[in-house]
């Protein structure tokens, strides 16, 4: 409250000369501070990226001969590991699929009406209808052949 009265009574608002000079210096100081902070952060990140690059080059220089010497062993081993991992993942996925199919069949056969049972019943009815139509058509042709 006292600050509000002082601003109104003392005239220390934005309209007088002293406040305007302070306002012009404020953005310059903030800009300078932001620039120094950005330069410091950018410079330190540049130094760190250079150190990481140098470390990577040194590590590759040391590791390349080792990889070349052991590549006849490492490459087939990596291929074998990849194939084994793919086999385990595939067998696990197929096992889960088989369990879900058996679960669905159990629910269907016990009458618990799992999702998709209506479609299966509809397809079964259509197949039975077509089979009946084919049987009747075949019986009709047999009767015609015997009559002539």
From Swiss-Prot:
Residues 35-106 are annotated as: Hydrophobic. It comes from the Eukaryota. The chain crosses the membrane at residues 43-63, 66-86, 87-107. GO terms for cellular component: membrane; monolayer-surrounded lipid storage body. Residues 8-17 have a biased composition (Gly residues). Its main location: other. Residues 1-21 are annotated as: Disordered. One of its GO terms (biological process) is reproductive structure development. Keywords: Acetylation, Lipid droplet, Membrane, Repeat, Transmembrane, Transmembrane helix. The modification N-acetylalanine is found at residue 2. May have a structural role to stabilize the lipid body during desiccation of the seed by preventing coalescence of the oil. Probably interacts with both lipid and phospholipid moieties of lipid bodies. May also provide recognition signals for specific lipase anchorage in lipolysis during seedling growth. Belongs to the oleosin family. This is Oleosin 16 kDa. The lineage of its organism: Eukaryota, Viridiplantae, Streptophyta, Embryophyta, Tracheophyta.
